[in-house]
């Protein structure tokens, strides 16, 4: 399969821009119309799978909640395992935890301590790359577990927030749709 401009346009057409949400001046990129439309969701998953096909990885890690959609699909398509990065207190066994900075405060992600065996190559997958905090935290979880990051894949990148810069420490960063301008459709 080849990722065509037509495929990207099909995906882009299903991402709804919602002005002033969650606060004035913010344009929220709503992917629920894409997920509600079977052919568009299929196109998005196929395109992400194709974009990451050349990467060598053993598992996929994704963060709740929307990241689970694309992480699960990529793990399934590549016949690889899936590691769930959860908010604190959601996993029942021993965990490895990483805290990261948000615009206003901090947050944390956790994985089971045995989810990523040493030497495992892991693909970081999420729906959105914004400031890079969540993605960077997933990379840190992989490395803290003794694994290595094979690459990072996103459906959408908000390029104007420069989250990619937090990930360019040797990681391949792939995004299907990049909004370079906060007001762009």
From Swiss-Prot:
**Could you tell me the EC number(s) of this protein?**
2.4.2.7
A GO BP entry: adenine salvage
Location in the cell reads:
Cytoplasm
According to its UniProt record, this protein's enzyme class is: transferase
Under Pfam families, the record lists: Pribosyltran (PF00156)
Please indicate if the UniProt record lists DNA repair as a keyword. no
Listed InterPro entries = Ade_phspho_trans, PRibTrfase_dom, PRTase-like, UPRTase/APRTase
Q: Which GO terms describe its cellular component?
A: cytoplasm
Q: Which GO terms describe its molecular function?
A: adenine binding; adenine phosphoribosyltransferase activity; AMP binding
Write out the catalysed reaction: AMP + diphosphate = 5-phospho-alpha-D-ribose 1-diphosphate + adenine
Question: Its annotated pathway?
Answer: Purine metabolism; AMP biosynthesis via salvage pathway; AMP from adenine: step 1/1
Q: Which UniProt keywords apply?
A: Cytoplasm, Glycosyltransferase, Purine salvage, Transferase
What's this protein's family per the entry?
A: Belongs to the purine/pyrimidine phosphoribosyltransferase family.
Functional description taken from the UniProt entry: Catalyzes a salvage reaction resulting in the formation of AMP, that is energically less costly than de novo synthesis.
User: How is the quaternary structure described?
Assistant: Homodimer.
Entries under NCBIfam families matching the protein: apt (TIGR01090), PRK02304.1-3 (NF002634), PRK02304.1-5 (NF002636)
Record-given protein name: Adenine phosphoribosyltransferase
Q: Which organism is it from?
A: Rubrobacter xylanophilus (strain DSM 9941 / JCM 11954 / NBRC 16129 / PRD-1)
Instruction: Give me the gene this protein comes from.
Output: apt
């Amino acid at each position: 399969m080849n990722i065509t401009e037509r495929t990207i346009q099909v995906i882009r057409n299903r991402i709804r821009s919602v002005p002033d949400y969650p606060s004035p001046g913010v344009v929220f990129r709503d992917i629920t119309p894409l997920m509600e439309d079977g052919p568009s969701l299929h196109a998005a998953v196929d395109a992400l799978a194709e974009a990451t096909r050349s990467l060598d990885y053993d598992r996929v890690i994704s963060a709740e909640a929307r990241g689970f959609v694309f992480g699960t699909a990529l793990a399934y398509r590549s016949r690889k395992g899936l590691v769930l990065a959860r908010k604190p207190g959601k996993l029942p066994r021993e965990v490895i935890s990483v805290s990261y900075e948000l615009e206003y405060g901090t947050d944390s992600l956790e994985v089971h301590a045995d989810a990523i065996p040493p030497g495992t190559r892991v693909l970081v997958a999420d729906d959105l790359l914004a400031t890079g905090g969540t993605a960077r935290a997933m990379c840190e979880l992989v490395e803290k577990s003794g694994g290595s990051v094979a690459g990072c894949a996103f459906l959408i990148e908000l390029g104007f927030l420069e989250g990619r810069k937090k990930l360019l420490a040797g990681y391949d960063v792939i995004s299907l749709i990049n909004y370079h301008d906060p007001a762009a459709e």
